[in-house]
Amino acid sequence: MTLKLHDLRPARGSKTARTRVGRGDGSKGKTAGRGTKGTRARKQVPVTFEGGQMPIHMRLPKLKGFRNRFRTEYEIVNVGDINRLFPQGGAVGVDDLVAKGAVRKNALVKVLGDGKLTAKVDVSAHKFSGSARAKITAAGGSATEL
């Protein structure tokens, strides 16, 4: 005999009816498994309720200050990174930094002064820190803001 689609049945015990509480006098009847009287018998208790103890969300301090919605975020590149990525020197732009994987594309770039610079580089970026500008010019290069 071949198995047909109409012969298929769900596994025994896999399909059970939803328990209807509060119907009749059985184990889930009358008080519906909630016991007699008290808060939990009459209504739901919130998940955050800790039995009268001061709740954790009220014990912890609030966050101070605010986050400026109009702040401009910059991708950071240090002078040492430029020295490592471009040891031969030359012109270094944002596109070159993206190609080397130092920054994401379409990002504003700020050059900071951490590290040493030995090669002469002409860097063009959106912002420079004072120490970065000083190190680039000391190495014989130039710092151009876009």
From Swiss-Prot:
**Which InterPro entries does the entry mention?**
Ribosomal_uL15, Ribosomal_uL15/eL18, Ribosomal_uL15/eL18_sf, Ribosomal_uL15_bac-type, Ribosomal_uL15_CS
Record region (Disordered)? 1-41
Set out the biological process GO terms recorded for this chain's protein.
Answer: translation
At the top level, the lineage of the source is Bacteria
One Gene Ontology MF term:
structural constituent of ribosome
Indicate the secretion signal residues: none
Q: Which UniProt keywords apply?
A: Ribonucleoprotein, Ribosomal protein, RNA-binding, rRNA-binding
- Give me the Gene Ontology terms describing cellular component: cytosolic large ribosomal subunit
In what ranges is there compositional bias, type Basic and acidic residues? 1-10
Q: What does this protein do?
A: Binds to the 23S rRNA.
Subunit note: Part of the 50S ribosomal subunit.
Matching entries from HAMAP family are given as: Ribosomal_uL15
Question: What family is it from?
Answer: Belongs to the universal ribosomal protein uL15 family.
Q: What is the protein name given in its UniProt record? A: Large ribosomal subunit protein uL15
